[in-house]
Curated annotation (Swiss-Prot):
It comes from Salmonella typhimurium (strain LT2 / SGSC1412 / ATCC 700720). NCBIfam families: PRK10694.1. GO terms for cellular component: cytoplasm; cytosol. Transmembrane segments: none annotated. Gene3D superfamilies: Hotdog Thioesterase. The keyword Hydrolase applies. Belongs to the acyl coenzyme A hydrolase family. GO terms for biological process: acyl-CoA metabolic process; fatty acid catabolic process. This is Acyl-CoA thioester hydrolase YciA. The gene is yciA.
Amino acid sequence: MTTMDNTPQGELVLRTLAMPADTNANGDIFGGWLMSQMDIGGAILAKEIAHGRVVTVRVEGMTFLRPVAVGDVVCCYARCVKRGTTSISINIEVWVKKVASEPIGQRYKATEALFIYVAVDPDGKPRPLPVQG
């Protein structure tokens, strides 16, 4: 799962700007904020696959590879790596495009993790995923 490829794996599901309010005590973007963006991006893909509501049930292998600077563009790429009866496993990579710090234009993978979502009905109970077709 953790590779230093130079090409993002998956589809772009979320793109946002790293802001000063999202920094940690060292001035880098807080890891929890990155994880939140990953969960949002992964949920978008999971909802498309499930045709409806999903909940996050687990995160595996969260790996922070490089820090993120304020003002840089944060891009979440997601790909489904496994489908169960009710669950969807999505690998999410965060790639950064440096637009506010040197070297301008550089792209790199900042973090990666596996997020597991479960499709749920209106009562919050697991429901089967639709048949792939």
